[in-house]
Amino acid sequence: MKERKKIKVLFRLRSIEMGGVPRVVLDLLRNLPKEKFDLTLMLNLYQGELVSEIPEDIKLIVVEKGREQMSKNPFIQKIQLVMRRIRLEIYKQFPSLLYALKVKEDYDIEVSPGYAEFEMVLNSPNKKSKKVGWFHTDVSYDNNKSRVMKRINLMKKFDWMIFGAKQTRQVIEDIYGVSYPKSSVIYNVIKLSESRSKANAFEVDYPIRPVFSSMGRLHSRKGYSALMRVHKRLLDNGLKHSVAVIGGGSEMENLKKQRKELGVEETFMLLDSQKNPWPYIKASDYFVMPSESESYPLTIGEVMGLEKPIISTNVGGIPEMIEDGVDGVLVDCNEDAIYEAMKQFLTDKNLVDRITQGTKNADEKFDEKKIYQQITEVFENVLKN
């Protein structure tokens, strides 16, 4: 019997730092059916916390070294970084040169897992490959309309677009009047077994309880400044607790300064990025997500899998994940609403017990096999058109 030819798929990523998009890509590389697909990952920069998690059986194309492989001499490293930036700019202007030097095979499908890779994939000199894009962003909170329109127009050029939540696609039509007939909504895979396993790696002992944990990049729209003010207000009203935030980012110094000004250095813990955040989440009593915008955050499902009662702002695709009052609590995106929900968790044990019981259905809610099948069908069908 003649062996069926595998579909050759190239995933492009800028780098592989800790974050939602790289984690999704790594999961697909591990779990899409190898009997159907020949998978390759192409990194512009071989750097990031997740480098060690790249599957060994996956072909890897590296365009440029990461900082970790560079000289430890600051002067030499500075020169290396400048040269790297120049080479990357040349490759951006002349993608044919990049492919001639680095990409030795022709691929059937080239994938942009997020908007950062849109132009990389669309400018591929391989005109025969089908281009598939992913979009995970809630555009309603982006005030830079020209940037949003650029992304919207780039998405029209893909042979197929995958949106990470129904809301992510719908909001583009509602605000900008643009629809995507060649698209589908596929939720990101949430690896409940993985987060559960990693949660047992070590013990975490918080000094002040109960603890609200939270996890995300320290970006202004993630709402941590507001969360800190809510935390202070709860303490001032006699509700003892602490907050543990796992994540690094551009707002770290501002948050440290605010923490000092509010006098909550002992109770508002900034734990920075952690390669394994799950023991910190497991050791907490509740989880809070104060974001102004999200798409379909993996963290919500993973935390639910650890049976932690969740408070989240009612934004993006989160209402597609949390059933309000059943397996979590959804609140408006403002400090008063977050305050009232956190106060309720601290004072209403029956509510917390009910939400905790609701989280026990997480496995049924987030069925990963169904998602791998949906992606497989997209890749197979896009080649037929």
For the regions a protein language model found, what residue spans apply to each?
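Conserved acidic donor-binding segment of nucleotide-sugar-dependent glycosyltransferases
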Residues: 324-325, 329-335, 344-350
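A conserved mid-protein helix/loop that constitutes part of the nucleotide-sugar donor-binding site
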Residues: 19-27, 210-233, 239, 250-257, ...
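A short, well-ordered alpha-helix in the C-terminal region of glycosyltransferases
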Residues: 337, 344, 351-365, 373-377
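A short, histidine- and acid-enriched strand-loop-helix "catalytic/donor-clamping" loop
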Residues: 116-119, 129-146, 160
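Acidic anion/phosphate-binding donor-loop and adjacent secondary structure
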Residues: 143-145, 170-174, 181-209
